[in-house]
């Protein structure tokens, strides 16, 4: 009997809290984002929403603070096509990267002429190879400033039905690109497609600099660079870097670990995404 009373009491408490929650939302709205985040946390703790839902709600709130420069893919990491490319050259890049959309650069690579969507190549693959002209099948490129807020970019993507935009700096120079997937990942977490497992965790930029996915295991890092990094509490190189820094770092922040320089290349409000690593000279 006492167990039944306890369960009834728990339900009443949750019902009471839910009433307060509804009152907060529809009558006495939270005064600021901090109060709203606190309300979400309380909702999780009282099992009114699950943790995953809480994460998504927090993500929606946090994107209002972020700008495109915080989440964009930097220009050195952009995979592009050139206006002068033949069909064969385009297909070579496409099959290696497995992306579905590509910025097409001008001959001097200073400007983006437009976007190529891979499905637009299908009519040329079988019978019309000689008729192929990349310029004739380009889609217009959306260009946005680095300072644009992420939530405004998401709204623009939704209204224009576009999935990718070119990012320019204050001087009008291409500095990167942003996709709708980059923004959605801020809300729902990492989105992996069927090809993600084939993409390399470690990519070499030059003799001493590498771009590394933060989810790369410490074991793989050690095997690649012949290092002996080890930590019982974390398994990934991103986790190791964040532990050493002591907080969730922002883009551009760096730390030296055993003569290896780790620079935060891309990060969002929850995690490190990419690291730029400079290895010591031998």
UniProtKB/Swiss-Prot annotation:
Plays a role in the transport of magnesium and cobalt ions. One of its GO terms (cellular component) is plasma membrane. Keywords: CBS domain, Cobalt, Magnesium, Repeat, Transport. Gene3D superfamilies: 3.30.465.10, CBS-domain. SMART domains: CorC_HlyC. SUPFAM superfamilies: CBS-domain pair, FAD-binding/transporter-associated domain-like. This is Magnesium and cobalt efflux protein CorC. Residues 72-131, 137-194 form the CBS domain. InterPro entries: CBS_dom (IPR000644), CBS_dom_sf (IPR046342), CorC_N (IPR054115), FAD-bd_PCMH-like_sf (IPR036318), FAD-bd_PCMH_sub2 (IPR016169), Ion_transp-like_CBS (IPR044751), Transptr-assoc_dom (IPR005170).
